[in-house]
């Protein structure tokens, strides 16, 4: 536990599951920043202490990897993957159980009784954020067993500031902006964020969701579709209400510095993995769109092109005891 709280990561395995390995390595990359913010870090799985020691030694992990061999802590937190146990019981061939297995346990092409037995005891993977008193203040879990939120993404969603990496900066007549990815390296199943920090100039405002009802162009962060990345709906902060006295309008705006978050998920399908094996990087393009006004003038809408290039890291399928 750090002086300002802790991040507790529950994962399936540092031995046989490549998506968890990638998540743990990315967490290590952010460890100095977390500790500098007074946040302690630990990761929990049903792996043996030997497996965790060897993985930490191999990948340079310095934070605590804790063994919950009998899944007691996992069960106490209420995140034991009960789908696995059900899939080993008398209803294992029930179509609904099989469908749940393919969403929360293993793809149909890999599914077997032996695999289910190996996975039994794992948690639904996710992250808990604790305050300084050890109370859970937020939690982040995935809907699909191959997807993993990065540490950087969790911190952005929790409102904990990051040092922007590979930022794109610009200034227009009405505002300043900085666009950056939460992570510059991604892999299959990575859930990350693209962010735009926006600071209107003095006496300027841009329009927030809700203002479209009055005919104004709302600020937007619009990424072009990609076959390898799924974009979630943009997260908008709460707006202010601006009173435009000449027309007696009350309209939703942003006048102070704010951040738009565009969460994105790298495709985790076998087909996408095959495509990405031939790639070294992902290029994602889109635009930051807005209309700005001051107390007297509404300026023409503007659209600023934005492109991010992210390094691709390939999944690690090698088990800990394999050399």
At which residue positions do the language-model features occur?
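Structural microenvironment flanking redox-active thiols in thiol-disulfide oxidoreductases
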Residues: 21-76, 82-83
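Extracellular/lumen-exposed scaffold segments
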Residues: 156-323
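Short loop/turn microsegments at loop-to-beta-strand junctions
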Residues: 5-8, 124-126, 194-195, 288-289
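Thiol/selenol-based redox catalytic cores and closely related redox-interacting motifs
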Residues: 68-146
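Non-catalytic, surface beta->alpha helical segment in thiol-disulfide oxidoreductase systems
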Residues: 136-163
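A short local loop/turn or secondary-structure capping micro-motif enriched for an aromatic residue
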Residues: 2-3, 16-17, 83, 145-148, ...
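Short active-site neighborhood of thiol/selenol oxidoreductases, capturing the structured segment around
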Residues: 1-27
